[in-house]
């Protein structure tokens, strides 16, 4: 044994490449025949019946007064519209049938492209089933193919865990090896800055009174008085009759 597991199934089919179908693709004679057949069948078996049915329904709705007719052309515009819608609905409803016709062609690149696209859409379920088979094969090989060297390598890769020492006494409730690494709380000595002292109403009142007294003393200070008040008055003499004169 070379130590490698072969995951390929003996009867697995190699997927064939999808042919490129572009705008410049030239269809084969068989494909042209199928195109003409699909065109005729979709017209006679789908478009004509649906167009006729839609026109009859439209005419019935107009006659009952559910749909209003044109004042000049009558019901002709609505009937033409119903016919066109029925024609395209018939063409679209025949697309699946036409695709099946192309898939049944053996030597058709277009049919091969359609088959490959359908296989790819349905491939996830098969992919998961094959994957489960591969997983079972891998587990089988791993169960029978283990060696002492592989066991030693696995032991080396596993992490080594050392037991945490616990105190032998019953009074201690925490391991001795863990408390060393517990994050300590904030130091009580390092307190926050002192909070701002609350000012009472009496203190505020005293401060206002002091400031008022200071301003009052500034007003009554002689150095601040106006010049006229500080100028000395002249002496005036008064006689016995109350008359005054200056010397």
UniProtKB/Swiss-Prot annotation:
Keywords: Endosome, Phosphoprotein
Subunit structure: Interacts with OCIAD2. Interacts with STAT3.
Sequence ranges of Polar residues compositional bias: 119-146
Subcellular location(s) of the protein: Endosome
Organism: Bos taurus
Phosphoprotein as UniProt keyword: yes
Function: Maintains stem cell potency. Increases STAT3 phosphorylation and controls ERK phosphorylation. May act as a scaffold, increasing STAT3 recruitment onto endosomes.
Gene: Ociad1
One GO CC term, this protein: endosome
Bias (Basic and acidic residues) ranges: 217-240
Name the record gives this protein: OCIA domain-containing protein 1
Domain note: The OCIA domain is necessary and sufficient for endosomal localization.
Family designation: Belongs to the OCIAD1 family.
InterPro entries on file: OCAD1/2, OCIA_dom
Residue ranges, annotated region (Disordered): 113-150, 171-198, 217-247
Modified residues (Phosphoserine): 108, 116, 123, 193
Lineage, broadest ranks: Eukaryota, Metazoa, Chordata, Craniata, Vertebrata
UniProt entry tagged with the keyword Phosphoprotein: yes
């Amino acid at each position: 044994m070379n130590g490698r597991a072969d995951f390929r199934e003996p009867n697995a089919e190699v997927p064939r490449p999808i042919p490129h179908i572009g705008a410049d693709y030239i269809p084969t004679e068989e494909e042209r025949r199928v195109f003409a057949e699909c065109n005729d069948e979709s017209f006679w078996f789908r478009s004509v019946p649906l167009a006729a049915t839609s026109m009859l329904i439209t005419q019935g709705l107009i006659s009952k007064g559910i749909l209003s007719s044109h004042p000049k052309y009558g019901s002709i515009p609505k009937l033409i519209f119903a016919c066109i819608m029925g024609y395209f609905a018939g063409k679209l409803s025949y697309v699946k049938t036409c695709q099946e016709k192309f898939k049944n062609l053996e030597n058709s690149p277009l049919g091969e492209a359609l088959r490959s696209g359908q296989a790819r859409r349905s491939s996830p379920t098969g992919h998961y089933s094959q994957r489960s088979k591969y997983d079972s094969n891998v587990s089988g090989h791993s169960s029978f193919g283990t060696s002492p060297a592989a066991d030693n390598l696995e032991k080396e890769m596993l992490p080594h865990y050392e037991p945490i020492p616990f105190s032998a006494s019953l009074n201690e409730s925490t391991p001795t090896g863990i408390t060393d690494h517990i994050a300590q709380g904030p130091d009580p000595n390092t307190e926050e800055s002192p909070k701002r002292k609350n000012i009472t109403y009496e203190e505020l009142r005293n401060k206002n009174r002091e400031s008022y007294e200071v301003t009052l003393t500034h007003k009554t200070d002689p150095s601040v008085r106006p010049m006229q008040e500080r100028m000395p008055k002249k002496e005036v003499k008064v006689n016995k009759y109350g008359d005054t004169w200056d010397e």
